[in-house]
Amino acid sequence: MLPTILYSAILALSALTPSALAETRSSGCGKHPSLANGVIHLNGREYILKLPDRYDNNHAYHLVFGLHWRGGNMQNVANGESIQPWYGLETRAQGSTIFIAPNGKNAGWANNGGEDVAFIDAIIKQVEADLCVDQSSRFATGFSWGGGMSYSLACSRAKQFKAVSVLSGGVISGCDGGHDPIAYLGIHGINDGVLPFNGGVGLAQKFVQNNGCQQANIGAPPSGSKSSVRTDFKGCSKPVSFIAYDGGHDSAPLGVGSSLAPDATWKFFMAA
């Protein structure tokens, strides 16, 4: 009896070795994929899928959602209209990431009754059943209403997403839950006349609290300086940072050619 117990214990311990840790690998790993680049239809809605050029079905990839703004659409994100394609993240990913641009209802993310969060859930389920994804490495970013939807995911899906980057967002897609910690980056223009700067600060403060960070004053650059000031909160269980930049309600902070938001977002995601 004792040898049997010992043998079972050894098997249980062996399952915890790094080579056997498969819980973060999606069920699509090892499969020949049926999904391909382009527009995917799902439950009466649609999204754009972009795979790495050399997709390997045995390699677990990061998964990044790029969410469009009010009046925008998934093509704006994928093609780079008023922003760099995929918010500038695809070039920085260098083949490490699967990108998804969902299409909002009525060119927005009202998330009535949680329908947009449910749509994101359904996309994740479909993609990860077919493709190889590191399930501990999901991210979301977006501008304006896309930022609001990213914030909503931070509230309701903090255990499913590793980090979000909210560009000029507001509480416009709801905040169901909103008590769990998640890595949170906020980027906001000090002269935003659509979703005010102080509101963006308030979004970050929720996760300062959730993540147990030490309170700190958020710095801001002088108006007209064309510069930015970053605040990294200390003592957090998961990182929280906020970048204030000299600008308004801009889909590409400091201009489409600026590396500010793409660099900050990608580095934050990878360090989260």
Swiss-Prot record:
The keyword Hydrolase applies. This is Probable feruloyl esterase C. Belongs to the faeC family. It comes from Aspergillus clavatus (strain ATCC 1007 / CBS 513.65 / DSM 816 / NCTC 3887 / NRRL 1 / QM 1276 / 107). InterPro entries: AB_hydrolase_fold, FaeB/C/D. It catalyses: feruloyl-polysaccharide + H2O = ferulate + polysaccharide. GO terms for molecular function: feruloyl esterase activity. Keywords: Carbohydrate metabolism, Hydrolase, Polysaccharide degradation, Secreted, Signal, Xylan degradation. GO terms for biological process: xylan catabolic process. Its main location: secreted. PANTHER family: FERULOYL ESTERASE C, PTHR38050. GO terms for cellular component: extracellular region. It is found in: Secreted. Transmembrane segments: none annotated. Involved in degradation of plant cell walls. Hydrolyzes the feruloyl-arabinose ester bond in arabinoxylans, and the feruloyl-galactose ester bond in pectin. Active against paranitrophenyl-acetate, methyl ferulate and wheat arabinoxylan. Its EC number is 3.1.1.73. The keyword tRNA-binding does not apply. Residues 1-22 form the signal peptide.
